[in-house]
Amino acid sequence: MGTTWSVKLMVSPRTDLHPLHAAVQSQLDRVVAQMSTWEADSDISRFNRLSAGSWKILPPEFFSVLSCAIEIAKASDGAYDPTVGPLVDAWGFGASAGARQVPDTQALSDA
């Protein structure tokens, strides 16, 4: 998702950190596989390509995040909008973005 991670902890100098690193990386890989708009085959990318009214079984974690996003959108009266991806792309930001420029009226309407 275009970022890095690090963990700081205090352990004995003899502690083998490889299992911890592998466990953290495994969980992060799972999040990316489900929720990265930068990955064409992620669950969210496939979900976003569905036509309106289509059904898809979602992993429990993805469903939980999606449900929370919808609740925040409702609670904020739309100030937070989880469907803003096409608009972000139109302005030239995001995973599928083109050149950063002010989009024309049609591009904004399409988004």
Model regions and ranges:
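A contiguous, well-ordered beta/alpha segment that forms the leading edge of an enzyme domain
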Residues: 1-111
